[in-house]
Structures are given as C-alpha cells and as structure tokens.
C-alpha cells in the first residue's frame, strides 16, 4: 500500500508498473529501516524477501479491503439498516487507515525475515505507521480533488 503514494505510476509499463513500484518501495523502506535502527540485513534473504513482498503487498491490500468491507457491512448485518452502511462507505480516509494497519501487520511481519536479528514488533509498528501516514497524506491532499465523484463526500 505504501508504494502507491511515493513512486509515480508509469502508464507505458501497464500492470508491470505495480511490480516495479512495489519492489522498489519495499526495498527502500527496508534499507532505510536497517540504516536507522542499525539492524543487520541478511544479504541472501533481502532480495528474496523483497520480491515476495510484492504479492504480499497486493494480498495485504485485499485483506485490508475485506476488513473494511466487514466493518462497513456490520450495521446492515446486525440491524438491517443500509443507511449507516452507505454513510460509512463514503468516508474512505478512515477505512484506508484501517487498511494500512492490516497491511502493516502482514508486511512488517513478513519483512522481518530479511534481517538476521530484528525486533519484529518494532518493524511491524514502523510499517503500520508508514502506511497510515501515506494514507492520511492521500486522504488530505488528493481526495478533495475527487469531490462529487462517488464514493467521496465533500
């Protein structure tokens, strides 16, 4: 999820752009984390783990979307009232932050295998914060440009 906001999309590459952006951003984030925390990187596992983070990135977005969908749909399931479900679905910024937390847990734990010795809890929290901050940046700066377009409310 983090990669969408930091590396621009190149239309000429098509779907392959997703793979390049995801790999580059995950590798940059892990390298920066290793430098900041002075963690030791396993030179053999690092490229393998960053390659495996690409499909996990997509899976984390799907998992976060399912969690958000479950939360939005819960009032309808419990009380049969669709109005609250419709109101919650309009505010994607809050649900995007929830997606970022779920994605941060999945990616942070998986990324910990690229290090020889690392505090997994700290890495997961760092990944969750990075995803949440990038989601809030998009919600604050880019969502207002979509005013009037469903599902955004202005």
From Swiss-Prot:
Gene Ontology terms: cellular component: plasma membrane
Protein name, UniProt field: Uncharacterized protein AF_2166
Record field: transmembrane: 15-37, 58-80, 95-116, 123-145
Key words, A-Z: Cell membrane, Membrane, Transmembrane, Transmembrane helix
Organism: Archaeoglobus fulgidus (strain ATCC 49558 / DSM 4304 / JCM 9628 / NBRC 100126 / VC-16)
Source taxon at top rank: Archaea
Location, primary (coarse class): membrane
Organism phylogeny: Archaea, Methanobacteriati, Methanobacteriota, Archaeoglobi, Archaeoglobales
Subcellular location: Cell membrane
